[in-house]
């Protein structure tokens, strides 16, 4: 059974949840830990001879130590590159929190030191007309890792996301500052200082923008900027 399970969310879509997750997995592997990860639902998948494949889920598959089939890591694969609940409707698929919870519990029973479950978009992304993705970590009672893009407006988005997570009865286990774009925001250190003081959770690291780097090499390089001790110390 997975010793530590965390749900990874972001303040928005496109903030780098997958690269942060992969970097955490690489850091855990470097510490001698067995790792698992999954992205239960993914839109924007590509047609391949093996079926629908999502580049984020493939990155997670490459980063884990306990090798698993793709369909176990990404059981709900959707082709349209749009919001998951709309993509599911267009594909004629029913997506519910309980269905995703079932996939996650199936992963949790596998032996590992660390399991990361990556969400889609931000905390309140819809799964259907009645539920949001927040219902999944809520049902599983998972601590949450919050990915914050270091750009204008991120303080407000990070604080609101953390408030929503806690309002749902869950713990923000840590946060990671990420640079999803090359441009560095002005007064970045002031922003980091504010978040470190007011977000109420440990900063696990700040990941730089990597230029002219092979995508496959990024997680291992970025893992050096992380301190994942708060995630694996017990």
UniProtKB/Swiss-Prot annotation:
The keyword Acetylation does not apply. Pathway: Cofactor biosynthesis; biotin biosynthesis; biotin from 7,8-diaminononanoate: step 1/2. One of its GO terms (cellular component) is cytosol. The keyword Iron-sulfur does not apply. It is found in: Cytoplasm. Belongs to the dethiobiotin synthetase family. This is ATP-dependent dethiobiotin synthetase BioD. It comes from Marinobacter nauticus (strain ATCC 700491 / DSM 11845 / VT8) (Marinobacter aquaeolei). The lineage of its organism: Bacteria, Pseudomonadati, Pseudomonadota, Gammaproteobacteria, Pseudomonadales.
């Amino acid at each position: 059974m997975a010793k530590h399970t965390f749900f990874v969310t972001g303040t928005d879509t496109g903030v780098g949840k997958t690269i942060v997750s992969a970097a955490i997995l690489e850091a855990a592997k470097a510490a001698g830990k067995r790792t698992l990860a999954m992205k239960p639902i993914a839109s924007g998948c590509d047609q391949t001879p093996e079926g629908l494949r999502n580049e984020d889920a493939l990155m997670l598959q490459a980063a884990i130590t306990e090798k698993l089939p793709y369909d176990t890591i990404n059981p709900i694969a959707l082709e349209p590159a749009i919001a998951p609940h709309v993509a599911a409707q267009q594909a004629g698929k029913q997506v519910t929190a309980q269905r995703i919870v079932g996939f996650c519990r199936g992963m949790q029973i596998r032996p590992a030191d660390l399991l990361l479950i990556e969400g889609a978009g931000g905390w309140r992304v819809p799964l259907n007309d009645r539920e949001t993705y927040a219902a999944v970590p809520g049902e599983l009672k998972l601590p949450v890792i919050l990915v914050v893009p270091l750009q204008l407006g991120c303080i407000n988005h990070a604080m609101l996301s953390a408030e929503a997570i806690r309002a749902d009865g869950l713990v923000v286990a840590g946060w990671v500052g990420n640079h999803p774009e090359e441009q560095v925001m002005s007064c970045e250190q002031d922003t980091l200082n504010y978040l470190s003081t007011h977000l109420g959770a440990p900063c696990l690291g700040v990941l730089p923008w990597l230029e002219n780097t092979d995508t496959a090499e990024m997680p291992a390089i970025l893992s050096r900027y992380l301190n994942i001790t708060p995630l694996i110390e017990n």
